[in-house]
Each structure stands twice: as structure tokens, then as C-alpha cells.
Amino acid sequence: PVLEQADALIDQGHLYKTGGAASVARIEVNGRQLVLKRYNIKNTAHWLKRFWRPSRAWHSWIEGHRLEFLDIATPRPLAVLEQRVLGLRSRAYLVTEYVDGPDLTACFAPYVESGDAPEEQVDALVHVMQQLIRERISHGDFKGHNLFWHNGQWSLIDLDAMCQHATQLSFA
């Protein structure tokens, strides 16, 4: 039911981002908080670049499951949909669990002047970076707004540019 009414749910939800390449909203379905992301097609040129390869939603779905398998925190991917026109990819949607908590930027903002950030959060940030390095994973958009503090660890979001590199050379 969520994906059948995805656009309406995004319009009714708490919008985090709208327009451009993606629209993201926190939605509530049967009392459960979820995040619904619509990957938009901006124009014909964008469509020509995207229609022939798996969508960014599909890529995020795969990478979310990869992180889950590797025990790297990320909101659990729950559903993905690629819309097609005459068999060619068009818009795509991703549904994930909602992770409640502040992002890294908000967590560390009070400590910019002093540099005295909470040791637990700093250690957890080092830990997630070590996990990514160990697995040769580059996030593709690794910034403070894409890391959320949840249950004592940093949880990664916005995985559509994530890549696990086959060799150390390609990772470096």
C-alpha cells in the first residue's frame, strides 16, 4: 500500500527535501514512522543518463542490505519500486525505517569552538570510518547530514552513491 500511494504520502508527510534529484519525507503508516524517498527525473537529458541502468533507489536498496550484512548501522531498507514506461526506467522509490536522532552536524555544533566533543560520539565516528575502510566502501556523499546518532552509534543514510571497491587501489 505504501508504494501504491507514494506521491500522496510524500505530499502529506514531513518533507526533508523536495524537488531536484530527489524528494524525501518522513511518513506514518499504521502508526509506524518510515522514510520515503522519491528519485526524480529532472529532465530529458537526466532521463537519457538514467533509464538504461538500475535506479539510485535500487542501488540504495542493495547498499542498505550490504551495510546491514556487514553490521554497519543504517536504516533498514524495506521496499523499493522502479517505475517503467515501455520497459524503460523512470521514477523510483525507496522506503526505509525511520531513524530518530540528530545528525552529526547538530551533535558536534556545540563543540566547534572548544573541540571537546563527547568521547562516545567521536569513538563511534572513528569506528564507523574504520568499518568502511576495512570493507573498502566509499560513501559517495559522506557529510554530517548523512550520519545520524541513534542507539549509541552513527547510522549512515543517502546510500545511492555508495561503492564497495574490489581492490585497495580503486579504493585509495
Residue locations for each model-derived region?
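Conserved ATP-binding subdomain of kinase catalytic cores across diverse folds
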Residues: 2-105, 124-135, 139
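Structural motif
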Residues: 29, 149-150
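Short glycine/proline- and charge-enriched loop/turn segments
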Residues: 42-46, 111-113, 158-160
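A short beta-strand motif that forms the metal-chelation/ATP-contact edge
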Residues: 93-97, 153-159
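AlphaC helix of the protein kinase catalytic domain
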Residues: 104-114
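Short alpha-helical scaffold element within the canonical Hanks-type protein kinase domain
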Residues: 118-122
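Hydrophobic residue at the +6 position relative to the catalytic HRD Asp in the kinase catalytic loop
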Residues: 142-149
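C-lobe/activation-segment region of protein kinase-like
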Residues: 155-172
